[in-house]
Each structure stands twice: as C-alpha cells, then as structure tokens.
C-alpha cells in the first residue's frame, strides 16, 4: 500500500500527464483516504494543467495534432479519477499563461527545469533535459514557491 508522509506535492509542468497515465492509482487512493479529513491531514496537493481553451495551448507544443488530444484525454482521466470528491477537486486548476519552467515541489525540495524553445517559440522535448533540485527554503526555492503560488492564484478550477 502507498504511504506518503510528506506535506507538499505541487506540480506545474507536463508531469501531470504522467500522473494520470495509470501508474499512480495508489497515490490517488491514498489522497482519497486522506480527504476524509477536512484538512487532508496536512497534505497540500496541487496540480496545474494548461487550459485547453487558452490561446497558449497553440504554443505549448509543436505537434498540435498530438498535444491537444493528449491534454484533453489527461483532463478526462483526472476528472474520472477524482470523481465527485469535492476536496480533491480543489487540488486541480488550469492556467492560461505561457509556461516557462517546470516546478515540482516535493516537501522541502524543489525540482526545477527550464524548457528550451525553438526559433518559432515552441518548447523542445524535455527528454534528457537537465533539472535542478534545491531547498524550498533557499532563495531560489522561495522564488519558485512565489511563482507557483501566483500561477495557482490566477488559475481557474478544473472542476
């Protein structure tokens, strides 16, 4: 069985697509169990998706014929997985801004990567791209937390 003993799990970047690829059912079962408590036992889970109706979706991936259907399918899988759990529904939002970085917060660690863009402004594939890990309490960590929080506050509810 899955046990997450940390407090923070925030995702801003396409890793949300991997989250709903089928390999994380135990995580969502665990979150479902924790959601029986109004405060989720202190777990702060947040996941941001690109809004498929935003203008930015046209610039998010050079293969639009693949990206947009994948994004919509992932959102459908998320909605199916979360169902009518209103507490977990609040953990998901959609942003419309251009994503210039990947920020994942896992407790007191920040996993950070900056996509490279081609000459047309499309992000290049992130496979084998280097990433950095630093403390959430470091100056860079605090900057990432501020950026994530600002995007979260501007985003609209997924459900």
Give the location of each predicted region:
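Short hydrophobic-aromatic micro-motifs
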Residues: 103-106, 110-114
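A broadly tuned preference for mixed-charge, low-complexity surface segments
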Residues: 62-70, 102, 152-159
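Signature of lipid phosphatidyltransferase scaffolds
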Residues: 113-159
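Non-catalytic C-terminal interaction segments of nucleic acid-processing enzymes
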Residues: 86-88
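Primarily the HKD phosphodiesterase
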Residues: 2-83
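Short, well-ordered, mixed-charge alpha-helical segments that flank or form enzyme active sites
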Residues: 19, 101-103
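Generic structural signal for residues in well-ordered beta-strands
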Residues: 90-92
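Short, small/polar residue-rich loop motifs at catalytic or cofactor-binding pockets
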Residues: 96-99
